[in-house]
Design a protein with these regions (language model features):
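Nudix hydrolase/Nudix homology domain
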Residues: 8-12, 76-119
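Flexible, glycine-rich phosphate/dinucleotide-binding loops
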Residues: 8, 22, 73
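N-terminal strand-loop-strand
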Residues: 1-14, 42, 68
Length: 119
């Protein structure tokens, strides 16, 4: 997770991520953003596509990927403060987590399908 240093959601915890670049698919963008923001590379993790969100009024499409590390890693990044967390936090707490409850919704599905997703 990252603690955002800028708006939106300054001071709140969020997932790392970013925009899909031209001629790039969502999975490649997820790996690229993960490495840029945390130093976690394709060699360290296999990502799986979990879900998508479409915000029609904001013309925004969000792809969500999840993965399990294949080794212990110390994350580092310049953009935001990074930290590891456990799956048992209250990710619906909007005083701690960005996204108006979306992180809670996403993490609820990660927990529901963790045996399949995080094998």
């Amino acid at each position: 997770m990252c603690k955002r240093r800028k708006n939106p959601y300054k001071g709140l915890s969020n997932f790392v991520g970013g925009k899909i670049e031209e001629n790039e698919n969502g999975l490649d963008a997820a790996y690229r953003e993960l490495e840029e923001e945390t130093t976690i590379s394709r060699n360290d993790i296999i990502l799986s596509h979990l879900m998508d969100f479409t915000y029609h009024l904001g013309n925004c499409y969000l792809e969500v990927y999840v993965g399990k590390l294949n080794r212990a890693i110390n994350v580092s990044g310049d953009e935001n403060e990074l930290y590891w967390t456990t799956l048992d936090n209250d990710f619906f707490d909007v005083t701690k987590y960005a996204g108006e409850g979306n992180i809670g919704h996403i993490m609820m599905h990660v927990k529901m399908y963790q045996e399949e997703l995080l094998k």
